[in-house]
């Protein structure tokens, strides 16, 4: 069984969320469970051309949450959250 990861969220990611409401609650709940489901990956991946690091992107309540797994230290780093526009 995969080991759970500790989740770290860049504070700037929280600033784009609504101050209250269901959408905010859904994203915060995703942060809470991400450590135990990170091994499943996101909805899609992006590769940073400079670092060659793979980032996972998950759609949650109208937001794109970008994160990566730092395997050696069992941590997940949430590095970006932005609203999805059509």
Task: Locate each region found by the language model.
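Arg/Lys-rich, positively charged N-terminal/basic patches that mediate binding to nucleic acids
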Residues: 1-32
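A short, aromatic/hydrophobic, helix- or strand-capping loop or linear motif
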Residues: 28, 32, 39-47
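Short, charged/polar low-complexity linear motifs in solvent-exposed/disordered segments
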Residues: 33-35, 84-85
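N-terminal hydrophobic or amphipathic segments with adjacent small-residue motifs
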Residues: 35-36, 56
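Basic/aromatic recognition patch in beta-strand/loop cores that engages polyanionic ligands
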Residues: 43-86
